Amino acid sequence: MEGESTTAVMSGFVFGALTFHHLNSGSDTEGFLLGDVVGEAKNSITDSQMDDVEVLYTIDIQKHVPCYKLSRFYNVLGDLNIPELKKLLADQKKSQNVIGWYKFRHNTEQIMTFRERLLHKNLQEHLSNSGLVFLLLTSNPATETKSTHRLEYALHKPQDGFFHKVPLVISNLGMSDQQGYKTLCGSCVSVGLNTTIKKHRLEFFNEDGALAEVNRISNMYTTLQDELKKTCSQLVESEHSVEQLLEAINELKKQIAEKKKLNEETGNKVSEAPEENVLLCEALRKFFPQSTLLQSCRLSLGGRQIPHSCTASHNISDVNELTLMVKQYDIPEAHTRQAGKRKACSKQLGRTLTKKSRLLQLQKQHSQNGDSEGSDSERPLCNSGTETDGDILESLHMDVSRSKSPIF
C-alpha cells in the first residue's frame, strides 16, 4: 500500500523578505519562488507482514525573485510573455529550480482567480514542471480604523484538475523540531558571496579544501581545555578546604558557647555557695572533739557564717600542725594595717632623728663656749627616745643656764 503526502518549508528570513517587499509597495506584487523538492520513502512493516510505503515530498522554498512591475511576464488573458520571462530568470543558475510563483493582493479573499489558474497552467507547460506551486498572500484590515491588518497566506498545488492547499511551515529559531541537521539541500548562495570566497579562498583554505588554521585552532582549544580542567580541580580543592574550615569554625563556636554556658552556670553556683574555711573546721574537730556545737559551726574565708553544718572529712595531711592561734600576717587586713603603721612610724622616726641631730649640734656649741670643769657639763645629752621636742628644748635650756652660773 502506497501513499503520498506533501509539505512545504520556508525559512523565516525568506518569509520576512517577502512580507517586507509587499508592505512597502503601494500595489499588488508578484514573483517567482526558487528552491528544491525532495522525496523520501518511508517503509513501515505492520503486524500482518505487509509493507506500508509512504512517500513524503518536501518543498523547500529557499529564495524569491520579485517582479517590480505588475503583469510583466503575462497579459490580461493570462498568456505568457516569453522574452520578459527569460529576462527575469536569466540570472538564475541551473541548480536553482523554479518551484513556483507567488502573488500579494490587498483587501481580497484567499481565493485564486480564473486568470491566475490559466497563468499557472501556462507556466507548468512552459517550465515543464507539473508540480509547480502557487503562494497566495492577502492582507485585510483587522479594525475599522484600518490601523491593524491581518496577513493570510496559503500554498496551492494542482492535483487532478483541482487546487489543493499544501501545509506550509515557517521555520523559526524558537522551534525545537528545527534544531537538528537538515536533510535537504542548503539555501541558494548569491553570486557576490561566491566571488568573495574565491578571491580569499587561498588565505583561509588549503588545496584539499580544509581550513588552514584548523590544526592551530584545535591545538589552542585542547590547551584551553587542559587549563580549564586544572582550574576546575583547583577550584574543587579550594571549595573543599573552605567547607572544612567552615565546619571547624562552627564546631569551635559551638564549643565556646557550651564552655561559656558552663562557666556561667558554675559561676552562679560559686557565687551562691561561698567557700568554707576548711582549716578552721578541722581545727575545731581536733581541739573540741566532744563539742557538737562548735563542730557544727561553718565559716567562710571572709568570716561569714554558712547556714548548713559540715559533716564531711576534708582529708588534710597536716592536721597535727593546726592551731587556733592565727598569726597577724596570715590575716590580709591585719597585714595591711601593720604595714601602714610601720610606714607611719618610720616617717615619724625620721623627723625625730633630724630634730635630735640639730639639738645635738646646738648642745655641742654651748658646751664649747661654757666651762668644761663641771661634772654636769660633761654629761652627754641622752634621750630615751620617748621625749617630745619641748622636753628636749627645756633640758637644753637648763643645761645652758647651768653652765653660765658661777661656781663657788
UniProtKB/Swiss-Prot annotation:
Phosphorylation of Ser-405 of the pSXXF motif by ATM or ATR constitutes a specific recognition motif for the BRCT domain of BRCA1. GO terms for biological process: chromatin organization; double-strand break repair; mitotic G2 DNA damage checkpoint signaling; positive regulation of DNA repair; response to ionizing radiation. A motif (pSXXF motif) lies at residues 405-408. Keywords: Chromatin regulator, Coiled coil, DNA damage, DNA repair, Nucleus, Phosphoprotein. It holds the Pfam family MPN_2A_DUB_like. The keyword Membrane does not apply. CDD domains: Abraxas_1 (cd23523). InterPro entries: BRISC_Abraxas1 (IPR023239), FAM175 (IPR023238), MPN (IPR037518). Belongs to the FAM175 family. Abraxas subfamily. Involved in DNA damage response and double-strand break (DSB) repair. Component of the BRCA1-A complex, acting as a central scaffold protein that assembles the various components of the complex and mediates the recruitment of brca1. The BRCA1-A complex specifically recognizes 'Lys-63'-linked ubiquitinated histones H2A and H2AX at DNA lesion sites, leading to target the brca1-bard1 heterodimer to sites of DNA damage at DSBs. This complex also possesses deubiquitinase activity that specifically removes 'Lys-63'-linked ubiquitin on histones H2A and H2AX. This is BRCA1-A complex subunit Abraxas 1. It comes from Xenopus tropicalis. The lineage of its organism: Eukaryota, Metazoa, Chordata, Craniata, Vertebrata. The gene is abraxas1.
